[in-house]
Amino acid sequence: MNSTEFTEDVEEVLKSITVKVETEAEDAALDCSVNSRTSEKHSVDSVLTALQDSSKRKQLVSDGLLDSVPGVKRRRLIPEALLAGMRNRENSSPCQGNGEQAGRGRSLGNVWPGEEEPCNDATTPSYKKPLYGISHKIMEKKNPPSGDLLNVYELFEKANASNSPSSLRLLNEPQKRDCGSTGAGTDNDPNIYFLIQKMFYMLNTLTSNMSQLHSKVDLLSLEVSRIKKQVSPTEMVAKFQPPPEYQLTAAELKQIVDQSLSGGDLACRLLVQLFPELFSDVDFSRGCSACGFAAKRKLESLHLQLIRNYVEVYYPSVKDTAVWQAECLPQLNDFFSRFWAQREMEDSQPSGQVASFFEAEQVDPGHFLDNKDQEEALSLDRSSTIASDHVVDTQDLTEFLDEASSPGEFAVFLLHRLFPELFDHRKLGEQYSCYGDGGKQELDPQRLQIIRNYTEIYFPDMQEEEAWLQQCAQRINDELEGLGLDAGSEGDPPRDDCYDSSSLPDDISVVKVEDSFEGERPGRRSKKIWLVPIDFDKLEIPQPDFEVPGADCLLSKEQLRSIYESSLSIGNFASRLLVHLFPELFTHENLRKQYNCSGSLGKKQLDPSRIKLIRHYVQLLYPRAKNDRVWTLEFVGKLDERCRRRDTEQRRSYQQQRKVHVPGPECRDLTSYAINPERFREEFEGPPLPPERSSKDFCKIPLDELVVPSPDFPVPSPYLLSDKEVREIVQQSLSVGNFAARLLVRLFPELFTAENLRLQYNHSGACNKKQLDPTRLRLIRHYVEAVYPVEKMEEVWHYECIPSIDERCRRPNRKKCDILKKAKKVEK
């Protein structure tokens, strides 16, 4: 662009401004006042004079300086216009000042062509929106000016972007309001103009900073891309030599494997063994020094890679990334998260003791580490075995769940566990209630909250406040009130006259525990809850006054003592008597599932004589059982539930029998190897693992020859699986139990949603839960029998499949896998 073209453009701008000012003068009645128009015209004249001077001086400059001069003059124009506006604002009335600012805004809007479209109607302003400048500026970037306006736009905008007059326009455009409203606003707050000016200044500064930040991000992205191009694909997997303390010998690894039940369990044990620092609070109590954000532990990729390398030795299927992500990785994350969630719960307690989160039979870490680290490992073991009074062992929780027929009973078990001081010889419990109702003292809210947390985990319905108060809090209060009925000297025999039916509450307590006698039973260290002790030496056992099926049914004093001392509660004592007096029902055939006490629900009735004998022994040690209502409400349900429930002892025995001890290469030392999957594949290629441990050898029939017969019972068509689908699930499964659990996800898609409805279900409907659809459960067993035909299918189903199904219902959501995606397709 030469000087002649620039002069012509400026003259066109001057003409357009003059026309608009004259039109506005004719319609002065529509605006504010003549004075405002006069001052507006003066301000326009000053701007025109500045432009004319600029154009005249422009002609004297050589062509080589065309890019710099307009920028200089424009920078000089902006402060001049601002100073003129400030003077007019100070020397005129609010209304006049507003008119001047509005006029100046319109005139400057015409001075800078290309930043707004021409307006045909001179009486109507071309813009009336607040923050017009911001939105219009965005449109300018998207739609660059065209035609004759482009040249002037390049002169005043592109020459020096940092000095754009848009800031002046932004300062003046908020003034474009009607005179009356603006005048009133100015009277109320004379500093509004300066506030708006400061606001837009801050916005411009923020925009500039964000632009710089985006530029730096772009540079970093380019640098990362450049580095990625230099790294060859073969070098993407890092080969690292772990430090000596993270290396295990073959014998040490085999010792851990022998204690593991699955690949995920082995991974968790290796996590504890190799990285004990992840489970300590040393140097981890501080948060971020800059922002104060609390630090959070997590498993790093090197941790996981080292664990995976060891797991692959005994579980080759883990070499498949999909198997690792579906079976081991979720269990690792769940184990690690549960540990720290429990640790946070302990830290919230007043006592600073550390709980034993791991199993009591855990192998001493000193055997696995080098001699130089034995002292450190032993100190870690000592610190990890300090029992906390506020943490319940996993074994205890399992037994509580087996015994509890309702959330209230489960809460009562936890009450005895966490508040042992209320149930000793002092009988302090009758002075307390959950929340201090009835003028009694309030239970420790922190320990009570722990009870509620445990109850909500296993009984999700208790998350509702009303359900908790009605079923659990009321049950706890009844238990505490019932201590007054049981008060009496320990030496005196219990009296029968204090147990009449009129004195019994609606919900009868069957738990009578004592925590102070734990030292007398060294063989049961994991037990924390006991029945009230009874001196069997002084106890006289009368003969029953009814006919007994045989003399072998009668129990001696020593037999009663043994059963009583191994029981968790008086209800558990009755269940153990059932097992002892009905041995024919507790075999591998599981005939007990066909029986109950009353013969209802299509089942057979248990022998009434032996049931009567059970009651005879129970009421001998627990006189409340003489009341028919107590016996029916509390004990009959326990006996029926024991008939439904699987035999825990039999299952443990079955697992012990099928546990495979893989012959490990003791002569080879893993420390001589770099932790490399390829080296492991070469050195540890041995005989195939048993079906329970390998997905490849899990199915008894070759997959190519697998043909699943059609079920001989009616099944809805959406739940029927093709042979191809069954083969895919078999390939993804690690054991027959895992296969059943995957079929559960496949056939019950409605339970595996965000609502977690599966937490309310289990296989049998025990523990106050709903029963899964029997038809689909029967279909799961049909598929299991098809791919895993064995002689003792009943054992496999009860000790492998049912526990896996129940565990899958209890387990929280984990990372989605292919089987879950297919389940969603079926739901659609």
Swiss-Prot record:
Tissue expression pattern: Expressed at least in heart, kidney, liver, ovary and spleen, with highest levels in spleen and lowest in heart. Expressed on the surface of T-cells.
Covalent cross-link (Glycyl lysine isopeptide (Lys-Gly) (interchain with G-Cter in SUMO)), residues: K20, K512
GO biological process: DNA methylation-dependent constitutive heterochromatin formation; negative regulation of transcription by RNA polymerase II; positive regulation of ATP metabolic process; protein homooligomerization; rDNA heterochromatin formation
GO molecular function: rDNA binding
Keyword Repressor: yes
Intervals of motif Nuclear localization signal: 56-58
Keyword Metal-binding among record annotations: no
Cross-referenced PROSITE patterns: BEN
Any coiled-coil regions, as ranges: none
Cross-link (Glycyl lysine isopeptide (Lys-Gly) (interchain with G-Cter in SUMO2)): 20, 41, 56, 58, 73, 128-129, 137, 142, 158, 176, 427, 512, 528, 700
Crosslink position(s): Glycyl lysine isopeptide (Lys-Gly) (interchain with G-Cter in SUMO1): K20
PTM-bearing positions, type Phosphoserine: S164, S379, S489
Modification(s) after translation: Sumoylated at Lys-20 by SUMO1 and at Lys-512 by SUMO1, SUMO2 and SUMO3. Sumoylation probably occurs sequentially, with that of Lys-20 preceding that of Lys-512. It does not alter association with heterochromatin, but is required for the repression of transcription.
Region (Disordered): 164-184, 483-504
Predominant location: nucleus
Protein name according to UniProt: BEN domain-containing protein 3
Organism the protein comes from: Homo sapiens (Human)
